[in-house]
Regions:
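Acidic/glycine-rich C-terminal interaction modules and beta/coil loop segments
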Residues: 3-103
Length: 103
């Protein structure tokens, strides 16, 4: 995996916004050294309104980024479109590199 244990942090998923990929109460391993946005990867992000959130970052066709929940219910979990450069105004805490949960 090529990670330094000093850069790893364990957090717990809350809610159903990332189902079916990540379930409520799953254990997540976050690599705090990987804070640059990468298309299609899942990150822990600090939101002033919501605290720490776990979402997928998707590059937009409109020169920006989308903060996306994996849950298909877009009425409850709508995409958040960030114009180019605005993604850097959010504090990316690290990339989620592993998850563990109940079978």
């Amino acid at each position: 995996m090529g990670v330094n244990p000093k850069n790893l942090k364990v957090i717990y998923a809350e809610g159903s916004s990332m189902e079916p990929t990540i379930n409520n109460h799953d254990v997540l391993l976050v690599d705090e050294s990987r804070v640059d946005p990468v298309d299609g990867h899942i990150f822990a992000i600090y939101s002033e309104n919501k605290g720490t959130i776990v979402k997928r970052l998707v590059m937009s066709d409109l020169d920006g980024w989308i903060i996306r929940s994996d849950n298909a219910d877009k009425t409850r979990y709508a995409d958040q479109v960030l114009p180019d450069g605005e993604v850097y105004e959010h504090r990316i805490l690290g990339r989620v590199i592993w998850r563990g949960g109940e079978l």
